[in-house]
């Protein structure tokens, strides 16, 4: 999934001699405002069947010793989320944390569960303060990952009417129930965004900034699905 942010940036006016504390000076006494873009993808997953679960994978450096004499080996540890509150998670650079939606009822040719892994493009954390309006109304941004059991009434991560609702609502409210999400019909909510400190090159019309994520098969296919593609032709493109 790819989203492109572009257009004319929001600007503010400065007094004579005033410093642009919250943005970048792009014209005389005009600054473009620092800001962030956020999106929440609602992924109603059906990986090889209706009953799914989410697994977290983290990489761990093995201490230098008999199994790691050169100090460069690492292994992975996995955790299966059982309830909604266990699945309220954030990215962690130190362990290259990833999440995979799996079907625990099926196996691939190596005996592992087939799945699809969320592969981020840009990881962003919100800069709003606790107690602010956006903190109350858009609390879903506090985590990169949420997982809920399927409910047709739970469609918008901030709730039905965020502009008229003082909050909290949506995902923070729904997940207070702490429902079971292991081997269930689940919905995965993934929050991603773009942190934009404006450049002069973004003015007056900014080029597209790409953001998003990928769903990459992880044990879903028994081998590389590219192996049986027809060979490329060397025909000339024109005559």
Regions of interest found by a model, annotated:
Residues 2-17, 21-239:
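Extended effector regions of multi-domain proteins
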């Amino acid at each position: 999934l790819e989203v492109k942010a572009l257009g004319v940036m929001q600007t503010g006016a400065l007094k004579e001699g005033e410093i642009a504390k919250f943005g970048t000076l792009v014209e005389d006494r005009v600054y473009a405002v620092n800001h962030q873009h956020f999106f929440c993808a609602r992924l109603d997953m059906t990986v090889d069947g209706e009953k799914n679960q989410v697994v977290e994978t983290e990489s761990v450096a093995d201490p230098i010793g008999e199994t790691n004499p050169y100090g460069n080996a690492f292994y992975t540890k996995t955790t299966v989320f059982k309830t909604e509150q266990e699945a309220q998670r954030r990215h962690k650079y130190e362990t290259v944390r990833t999440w995979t939606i799996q079907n625990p009822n099926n196996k691939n040719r190596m005996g592992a569960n087939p799945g699809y892994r969320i592969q981020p493009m840009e990881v962003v954390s919100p800069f709003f303060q606790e107690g602010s309006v956006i903190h109350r109304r858009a609390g879903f941004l506090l985590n990169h990952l949420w997982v809920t059991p399927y409910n047709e009434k739970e469609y918008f991560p901030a709730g039905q009417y965020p502009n008229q609702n003082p909050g909290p609502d949506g995902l923070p409210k729904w997940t207070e129930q702490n429902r079971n999400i292991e081997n269930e019909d689940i919905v995965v909510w993934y929050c991603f965004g773009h942190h934009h400190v404006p450049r002069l090159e973004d003015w007056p019309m900014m080029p597209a900034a790409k953001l998003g994520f990928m769903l990459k098969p992880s044990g879903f296919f028994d081998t590389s699905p590219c192996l049986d593609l027809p060979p490329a032709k060397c025909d000339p493109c024109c005559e």
